[in-house]
Amino acid sequence: MTGTNTDSDTEIEPDKYYIGVRYAAHVQNIGWQNEVSDGTTSGTTGRGLQIEAINIVLDNSTSYSGGISYASHIKNIGWQNEVSGGNISGTVGRNLQIEAIKMNLTGELSEHFDIYYRTHIADVGWMPWTKNGQISGSTGISYRVEALRINLVRKGHLHLEVLQIIIKISPCIHRNRQH
C-alpha cells in the first residue's frame, strides 16, 4: 500500500522487495504435508516421525535474480547434490530419513537477503538457527530431522526469533562432539 505522510508530504512505499519462502516436507507415514511459509513449522514434533524429503520455493521471486539452493544429508547415503527451484531434496518411498540440511541463496538475492533455517531432530529438539550454507541437523549419528523452519531476512535486519537466539557457531551435531 502506498500512503502519504501528512507531516512532511513524503510518500511512503511498502517493501516492494518482499520475498518470502514456501516449503513442504514429506513425512514418514504421512506423505507430503501442505506447503507452509516464512518460519512456520513443516514436519512434526513429538511424534517420532522422520522427514524424508523437502522442497522449497521463493514467494514473489521477481524482485531480484537468484534463488535458493539446498541439500540434504540422507541416512545410508550422505550428502545429496544441491537442488533448487522447488525440486525434491531427499528421497520418497525409500523410508530414509533426512539427518541434516543446508541452504544457500544465489544471485542478487544473496546480496540482499540471508536465509535462516533450523531443524528439530530426534533426541535433541530444536537446533539453533543457522544461515547461509551452515549445517543444521546431525551427521554421523543417525538422528532424524523431524521438522524444520525457514525464513528469508533482509541483510541488516534480524528476525525476532533469530535476535533472541543470536546464532550459535556451527550447531550441527557430529559423532562424539558438538561444534
Q: What would you call each of these model-derived segments?
A:
Residues 1-179:
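Lectin-type carbohydrate-recognition ectodomains
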